[in-house]
Amino acid sequence: MEASGKLRAYLELVRAHNLLGTVLGVIAGAALLGEVNVAAAIASASAAAVAAGGYAINDYFDVEIDKVNKPERPIPSGRVGAEEARKLALALLALGPLLGLAVGPLTGAYAALNAVLMYYYSKSLKKTGLPGNLAVSFSTASTLLYGSLATAEWAGEVARVLRTIPIILMVFLMTLAREVVKGVEDYVGDKEGGVKTLAVVKGPDFALRAALALACASLALAYLAAPLLSLGYAFLAFVTLGGLLSLASVAACLRSEDPVRCAAKPRRAMKVAMFLGLIGILVDRLVQPVFYPHVLHAGGEEG
């Protein structure tokens, strides 16, 4: 294989396009505390390394299922060897915590926790269904916590991290909804592989209804959390757009004659919703001083 083709295969293996969301999550977490600095940059690189390693080790352990669900993936298609993927994954999972230590011991330990979680999710938790969904949801939502933790630890004010918990829960719920929908999308291969997703255990329709409820709860929590973190109209506009897009997409899939085939649409819609939520945090922090300066930053002091 040509060098360029090999590079593309590696980038596909680590889901390079998804790493943008990881970096945005860390930066948004820092922005929640009102400051994006060098700690956020280091934490972004650390989180991206852990996420990339998690994606790679997932493909390594998931190769038999991917032969059914996604035969075009790098390992089942033969573009990346299984042992290559394993070594790359372990290197990235080790690199993340080492980078985190450059910020501080808590940030390094938190990166290590996520690295271990991603490894064992791929190795065994994934087949447990809901526990695996919860692990992925925690890992995704933790990017915001990672950003706020790194910023707070760098400033020597770790307790400030508690202010970000409501928004982290919002992301957690939307990610959990997406994972439930992903179980519907992968229903055929998961059933053959013995993966106990909600869709396999309770049926695709039940899983979609559960995802709809989780997405509703996530949107409601955004409205409750916004005033607690001094997030204003820009944030709410982005979150509302993403939330309504997700709800409409899941509802349309429920009305479909074949929910398994259409499940990719709400799964993508929820990914867009989470991206819009992160962008909403950043945009809100940028426009706040101009359009509604009376609203205090969550990490600032009253003046």
Curated annotation (Swiss-Prot):
A GO biological process of this protein is:
glycerophospholipid biosynthetic process
What's its catalytic activity? sn-3-O-(geranylgeranyl)glycerol 1-phosphate + (2E,6E,10E)-geranylgeranyl diphosphate = 2,3-bis-O-(geranylgeranyl)-sn-glycerol 1-phosphate + diphosphate
By its UniProt entry, which CDD domains does this protein fall under? Answer: PT_UbiA_DGGGPS
EC code(s) of this entry: 2.5.1.42
Question: Pfam family of this protein, just one?
Answer: UbiA
What GO CC annotations are associated with the protein?
Answer: plasma membrane
- Places the protein is found: Cell membrane
The entry's keywords: Cell membrane, Lipid biosynthesis, Lipid metabolism, Magnesium, Membrane, Phospholipid biosynthesis, Phospholipid metabolism, Transferase, Transmembrane, Transmembrane helix
Q: Major location, coarse class?
A: membrane
Membrane topology annotation:
Multi-pass membrane protein
Pathway stated in the Swiss-Prot or TrEMBL entry = Membrane lipid metabolism; glycerophospholipid metabolism
Q: Where are the transmembrane segments?
A: 23-43, 88-108, 130-150, 164-184, 206-228, 232-254, 272-292
Query: What GO terms are given for molecular function?
Result: geranylgeranylglycerol-phosphate geranylgeranyltransferase activity; magnesium ion binding
Query: By its UniProt entry, which Gene3D superfamilies does this protein fall under?
Result: UbiA prenyltransferase
Which metal ions or organic cofactors does this protein require, according to UniProt?
A: Mg(2+)
Query: Top enzyme class of this protein?
Result: transferase
Family under the similarity heading:
Belongs to the UbiA prenyltransferase family. DGGGP synthase subfamily.
Tell me the function of this protein. Prenyltransferase that catalyzes the transfer of the geranylgeranyl moiety of geranylgeranyl diphosphate (GGPP) to the C2 hydroxyl of (S)-3-O-geranylgeranylglyceryl phosphate (GGGP). This reaction is the second ether-bond-formation step in the biosynthesis of archaeal membrane lipids.
Q: Can you say what this protein is called?
A: Digeranylgeranylglyceryl phosphate synthase
Species name: Ignicoccus hospitalis (strain KIN4/I / DSM 18386 / JCM 14125)
Q: What is the lineage of its organism?
A: Archaea, Thermoproteota, Thermoprotei, Desulfurococcales, Desulfurococcaceae
